[in-house]
Regions:
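An amphipathic, basic-hydrophobic alpha-helix
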Residues: 31-51
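N-terminal subdomain of nucleotide-sugar transferases
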Residues: 1-32
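C-terminal alpha-helical cap of glycosyltransferases
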Residues: 114-136
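Conserved NTP-donor binding/palm subdomain of two-metal-ion nucleotidyltransferases/polymerases, i.e.
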Residues: 128-313
Length: 313
């Protein structure tokens, strides 16, 4: 269940009526009081806060924010979604630089829609919000399990991860599937789960919000490591690229000394040792496959942050 907290201005009877109609169809809570808002955030810990119009409250960092401007003029850059009441309002918000704008009409204002249709569309937006940036929603068990599953998938043999199993049960299969799909590693994750004898992930269609110009990365398996480092340098770090480098390092098709010479020729020494450190952390590559020692330096810190943030809006 998605926990939605509506917050709205006092003395706005139309918005109050609209929210209560939604609450009859979508399980949620609502308040127009700043103190009650703080209490609900602390005690109930909502997944989504849906702001309706202008409210005098401080942002709650742990929840995902959706806003219905109701006439407010802003780009709302820090919101997951902006809900316009009409296509005209949506166009005006886009002119202000708004993104992730959805049009959901208010049945109290227009007869073009009814409340059931409106509630269904609203719930779809809430689900898209919760499908977005899935890594941020991972619990510690999922974060612990992911490298082991991927490593088992890469090697195709659970003996490579015997000292790390049993791993925690997958309690977030949907989030894990969405994450793997967006990172281009779903087939590998499926293989790892099969190797470990774990329950397959449900392959269900989903919609989510993505950063502008984001494209699901594709595998470059078979490419040489220097080319993959060049790809990271130009386009940023991704899980699939780490997997591809891991696969290349454990293959018999390269010579460590020759590889290090090519890395140096292309001025990728610092990048390479940092990428090795990330592979060690994220995929548990065994030390025997390292052609040189990984390093945890300032570039590693940046790459680590980029890997966690590149799906964020």
């Amino acid at each position: 269940m998605i926990k939605v907290l509506h917050v709205y201005p006092k003395n706005d009877s139309l918005t109050t009526r609209f929210i209560h109609l939604l609450m009859d169809r979508i399980e949620s809570k609502a308040t127009s009081n700043a103190d009650e808002f703080k209490r609900l955030c602390r005690e109930w810990q909502p997944d989504i806060i849906h702001q309706h119009g202008s409210v005098d409250i401080k942002r709650h960092a742990d929840a995902r924010w959706v806003v219905s401007p109701n006439g407010l003029q802003s780009s709302f850059d820090d919101c997951y979604a902006v809900i316009a009441r009409s296509h005209l309002e949506a166009d005006a918000l886009r002119d202000l630089g708004g993104k992730r704008i959805e049009v959901i009409m208010n049945p109290l204002v227009t007869k073009q829609v009814d409340i059931d249709e409106t509630a269904k569309k609203m719930m779809k937006v809430y689900q898209k919000v919760m499908n977005s940036c899935p890594y941020d929603l991972f619990d510690e068990a999922t974060k612990t399990s992911l490298p082991v599953i991927l490593k088992a998938g890469i090697h195709g043999d659970k003996r490579w991860v015997e000292h790390e199993i049993p791993i925690p049960s997958i309690t977030q299969p949907r989030q894990l599937f969405i994450f793997a799909s967006l990172e281009g590693i779903c087939p590998l994750l499926d293989k790892g789960l099969s190797v470990l004898g774990m329950t397959p992930l449900p392959h269900e269609p989903f919609e989510c919000y993505l950063p502008e110009n984001y494209a699901i990365p594709s595998s470059t398996e078979g490419a040489n490591i220097v080319n993959m480092l060049d790809d990271i340098h130009r386009h940023g770090i991704t899980f699939i690229r780490l997997v591809n480098i891991y696969q290349a390092l454990i293959s018999d098709s390269h010579d460590d000394e020759e590889l290090l010479d090519k890395v140096e020729e292309n001025d990728y020494n610092e990048l390479f040792v940092s990428v090795l450190q990330i592979i060690k952390e994220q995929l548990h590559l065994d030390e025997g496959f390292f052609p040189c020692a990984p390093e945890n330096n300032s570039l590693t810190k940046k790459l680590r942050a980029d890997l966690q943030n590149h799906l964020r809006l």
